[in-house]
Amino acid sequence: MYRIAFDVNGNDNGVAAAVKASCQFLKENDNYEIILVGDEALINNELKLIENIPNSLKIINNPNVPSDVKNFHKSLRENTSMNDSIDLVAQGKADAVISSGDSGTYLACATFKLKRLQGVSRSAFMPLMPTIVGRKFLLLDVGANIECKSEYLVEWAKIANVYARTLLNIVNPRVSLINIGTEDYKGLEIVKEAAKELKDNKFINYIGYSEPRYLLDGVADVAVIDGYGGNLVLKSLEGAILSFKNLLKDKIMAKPIRKFGYLFLKGAFQDVAETLDYRNVGAAWLIGLNGLSIKCHGNSDSKAYLGALNQIKLVIKNNVLEAIKKELNDKPHE
């Protein structure tokens, strides 16, 4: 039986989405147990709306959230649902933790409690991203580290390489560094240094630099960048996708003839929307820790949470954490 600790207090819209997704996941996976950590009264109110509640759904009552997300030291000491959830993994009582709470607080608490893996200098946030060709790619770091060194980029590439084999089902993932151009002489020194080391790593399929504008074309399976640039790339891609959807909708609704034509193209438009829907992947992994940890959007709905839970299932099933430890020691995967 595998166990997932779920901090349900961090969602902007309450606990309903987390409860619904958890019940759906457990009905489809009878070898899992989910421990909902949050306001028990609110959780039970939502459970009243669900038929056939799985017996493998457990509750730990803790209605508290961090009182000051800018004060990480204070957050570490507080009795919160986030800390309780992470503690379950740290104590070996759960196999993974999931939360929608404040990103900085989650990063600090998870890093302090779970500890970094040997050979890892810094943790990083790593979401699965959609492309227009249907396949997905891993983007990291998207905000955990504003300042960066070349060794961080190399370490993250090694870790993401393992995740990509499992989450993307690719034997030899294409690993790339995001840069302002594809030429070797372009970019910051830390990027050039990381590129040289990745080229020399015989266990990584390093394909060179990738420009941000081509990421949605599926040019790489793993795209690595510092946290500052990665956060800008993430928000730019998410914003561009959303703006495109809204623009397309406005143009269709602007004229009656276009509305009529939409009736015949509705299926194609829905396919495009589904392909670019971030909720299908649901979350960002907090990588580099000695424990599985995943962070969801603060406004996640049940579809996004279910996507995150299914990612956790894949990673647990394929024993990714142990594979990462081997990768960090430059040992080939089996």
From Swiss-Prot:
Record InterPro entries: FA_synthesis, Phospholipid_synth_PlsX-like
Keywords: Cytoplasm, Lipid biosynthesis, Lipid metabolism, Phospholipid biosynthesis, Phospholipid metabolism, Transferase
Keyword Transferase set for record: yes
Organism encoding this protein: Mycoplasmopsis agalactiae (strain NCTC 10123 / CIP 59.7 / PG2)
Biological role: Catalyzes the reversible formation of acyl-phosphate (acyl-PO(4)) from acyl-[acyl-carrier-protein] (acyl-ACP). This enzyme utilizes acyl-ACP as fatty acyl donor, but not acyl-CoA.
Gene3D superfamilies, sorted: Isopropylmalate Dehydrogenase
Protein name according to UniProt: Phosphate acyltransferase
Gene coding for it: plsX
Subcellular location: Cytoplasm
GO cellular component: cytoplasm
The family this protein is said to belong to: Belongs to the PlsX family.
Domain of life: Bacteria
Annotated pathway: Lipid metabolism; phospholipid metabolism
Record note on quaternary structure: Homodimer. Probably interacts with PlsY.
GO molecular function, one term: phosphate:acyl-[acyl carrier protein] acyltransferase activity
EC assignment: 2.3.1.274
Catalytic activity: a fatty acyl-[ACP] + phosphate = an acyl phosphate + holo-[ACP]
